[in-house]
């Protein structure tokens, strides 16, 4: 039997981790696009 509060904590932590990971990847791609020298 799973403890509901444990499940909530785990899912919250997981979504925060995933959100942060996706956000950083997105941010890095944006910086890479903007940082290209146009010569």
UniProtKB/Swiss-Prot annotation:
Coiled coil: none annotated. One of its GO terms (biological process) is photosynthesis. Not yet known. It comes from Pisum sativum. This is Photosystem I reaction center subunit V. Pfam families: PSI_PSAK. InterPro entries: PSI_PsaG/PsaK, PSI_PsaG/PsaK_dom, PSI_PsaG/PsaK_pln. The keyword Transmembrane applies. Its main location: plastid. The keyword Plastid applies. It is found in: Plastid, Chloroplast thylakoid membrane. The gene is PSAG.
